[in-house]
Amino acid sequence: MTWLVLLGTLLCMLRVGLGTPDSEGFPPRALHNCPYKCICAADLLSCTGLGLQDVPAELPAATADLDLSHNALQRLRPGWLAPLFQLRALHLDHNELDALGRGVFVNASGLRLLDLSSNTLRALGRHDLDGLGALEKLLLFNNRLVHLDEHAFHGLRALSHLYLGCNELASFSFDHLHGLSATHLLTLDLSSNRLGHISVPELAALPAFLKNGLYLHNNPLPCDCRLYHLLQRWHQRGLSAVRDFAREYVCLAFKVPASRVRFFQHSRVFENCSSAPALGLERPEEHLYALVGRSLRLYCNTSVPAMRIAWVSPQQELLRAPGSRDGSIAVLADGSLAIGNVQEQHAGLFVCLATGPRLHHNQTHEYNVSVHFPRPEPEAFNTGFTTLLGCAVGLVLVLLYLFAPPCRCCRRACRCRRWPQTPSPLQELSAQSSVLSTTPPDAPSRKASVHKHVVFLEPGRRGLNGRVQLAVAEEFDLYNPGGLQLKAGSESASSIGSEGPMTT
């Protein structure tokens, strides 16, 4: 019996050691149609740098971001994006595409980003970009574009960023923007092309938010006075497209490629432009002063009634009815813009864009709003309180006057003026001097006087032969009559007699 138990234990140990094949519990990993040598990660498909001359035949349907850059693609099949109904970004840069063709993007209605940069495209036809109604960013820089169809971008209603730099374009229509909607367009890069003629009135009529993102540097622009004044004003207003690339704005002084001069550094070329009128090129923006917490109303003033009105906020947000995403800005039925509670975020440039069949061209109106905090209001002046306070102070002063003891003046600290009740020492001195005086008064006064003045000499003063001298101590105290002494001396006023009383 024991050996059976040992045998069963040994068999269990052998089974555990051998294990079970993986194929029973875990099926082999599915490849999800991932092309050969490509990398598939969730909704990302990267086939970059593989030297592909054609697009892979099978692409995963869950792909949202497709990267086919740095290959050798020369053609794109019509409808090749039909299985990719979730596609949002397509990277076709650094290939050898020289043309697109009709229907290439017809099934990419959800595409947001299309990168066609660094190819060899020479033209864009009327239907090359059909089907891209949701496209927001189109990169076409570093190609060989020479011609753009008049309606090449007609179907791109949501396009906000268009990069056409580093091409060979000699002209561009700023009037209709080749079918683009100026309501959404925020960035238009036309730098490093061959633009030799630009309509200044068309430039001036563009919305302010598009001027801020219009890049025209490194083009052989003409040294035109009106164009110079316009770009100079943009530079002074701080538009980033001009301010950030001011050193790269050049113009041809003598219509020769070798005569390029820098717009903002060599102003001698435009010395004669001071008399050229620069007014009327742009409609001046209106400056508004708003206080935090107050309400603000902006109106889109147009020459004739407009069919459609849209606004662009300082944060580059397109505003249509009912208003902004956060609800702080409302667009009303008449096209006006209302802010119920102004905050610091509402400071900046608000642009109104009006379109309609009766308007010869799109009209814009600009408001430069500055937001300030309200000053604290001063407290109201309380006359009742001040009256009560004045009465209390007056009562205290009256009580002090009636019941407070008189001021005992110190001779050095307090100098109070009091009329003396007794004759002062100076008065006594004056009286004695008048008594001792030998000058007889006038005759009438002697007759009128019936009084006799008698002076008795002290016994100790008899040896002075009747001569007395008035002397004042060094520290003469005006308020101590005892400090005044009569001294004998040789200089007396007069000598009248010796011992005995003297009568005068």
Curated annotation (Swiss-Prot):
Which residues lie in Polar residues bias regions?
424-440
List the transmembrane segments: 384-404
Q: Which residues form a coiled coil?
A: none
- Gene3D superfamilies per the UniProt record, alphabetical: Immunoglobulins, Ribonuclease Inhibitor
Where the protein is mainly located, per its record?
membrane
Q: Which domain of life is it from?
A: Eukaryota
Pfam families xrefs? LRR_1, LRR_8
Which sites carry carbohydrate? Answer: N107, N272, N301, N362, N368
PANTHER family, sorted: AMPHOTERIN-INDUCED PROTEIN, AMPHOTERIN-INDUCED PROTEIN 3
Q: Report what the protein is called.
A: Amphoterin-induced protein 3
